[in-house]
Amino acid sequence: MSQSGKNGLTYSDAGVDIDAGNLLVEKIKPAVRSTRRPGADGEIGGFGGLFDLKAAGFTDPVLVAANDGVGTKLKIAIDADYHDTVGIDLVAMCVNDLVVQGAEPLFFLDYFATGKLDPDQGAAIVGGIAAGCREAGCALIGGETAEMPGMYSSGDYDLAGFAVGAAERGKLLPSGDIAEGDVILGLASSGVHSNGFSLVRKIVELSGLDWDSPAPFTEDKKLGEALLEPTRIYVKPLLKAIRETGAIKALAHITGGGFPENIPRVLPKHLAAEIDLATVKVPPVFSWLAKTGGVEAKEMLRTFNCGVGMIAVVAGENVATVSAALEAEGETVITLGRMIAREEGAAGTVYKGTLAI
């Protein structure tokens, strides 16, 4: 028998709270407004977000798009009940992929899915997304919040991000003049960033620690909070260095797969990256993970950034100029390696020296 009249079912009875969704929208409006930039000044709530390329100052742009997630780092945020920074990670994973192609991030959209919507939790997450957008200089022009009872366990959620940027035609990276002898610069990471967290969680499980335990690799932080250090956003320093020096030939975002998977993606087939591992200043978190989990250096290098979240390829004569431009914007820069000749079928990344873990 169907339900009808005053005893009929409602959407809320099925586990979807429209009022909670509306409350979330009101809570996040100030955060969203704070991300406005030339080209985007609309309000959220429409069927689609708008962006005016001409108002953003482009004349002959090529659009560049990227999407990504945060992975199982979210599980730590959920278990530690700390949701303020995973939105920064979400933005970082997308916009860092745009800037490596020479593109300026313009706008961002998010997808937030949960089994039971908590407006305060959702506002914390979106607040982090807005913070990441401000840091990257892109507008949060829309998104989707999906309350899906039965799809997620209580308290669980997932995030996906979508970013679009632009570069003037002819200004895209990598350039076509990468050459043997060019120097590879490494930009320091802020921590584990957003890759390898399934292994991180397994190591923490083996350690016997919980998320509220003091972090064994840093002072004055709980383990969960320390591991949730947000992914560094390299956009503004890199864009400034690209424009001021004109000397950056290629960039690579060091994410899942580490050096061996990410650096070759931006290199011509006849060149390989020779990385001097002795130059890498490995942050304590990676040393702790390696020792606690008994993880070999080779596995660390293909799972984590190990302290280098971005690399840049420049000609030898431009190392000082590019390094100075990046350091002036707060980046820590090392000379990580150089470009060498690569035989057909050979690896795109080779190592010398020893990783200090």
Swiss-Prot record:
CDD domains: PurM
GO BP terms in the entry: 'de novo' IMP biosynthetic process; adenine biosynthetic process
Keywords assigned by UniProt, alphabetized: ATP-binding, Cytoplasm, Ligase, Nucleotide-binding, Purine biosynthesis
Catalysed reactions, as listed in the record: 2-formamido-N(1)-(5-O-phospho-beta-D-ribosyl)acetamidine + ATP = 5-amino-1-(5-phospho-beta-D-ribosyl)imidazole + ADP + phosphate + H(+)
Domain of life: Bacteria
Enzyme Commission number: 6.3.3.1
SUPFAM superfamilies: PurM C-terminal domain-like, PurM N-terminal domain-like
Alphabetized PANTHER family for the sequence: TRIFUNCTIONAL PURINE BIOSYNTHETIC PROTEIN ADENOSINE-3, TRIFUNCTIONAL PURINE BIOSYNTHETIC PROTEIN ADENOSINE-3-RELATED
HAMAP family listed in its UniProt record: AIRS
The protein's name in its UniProt record: Phosphoribosylformylglycinamidine cyclo-ligase
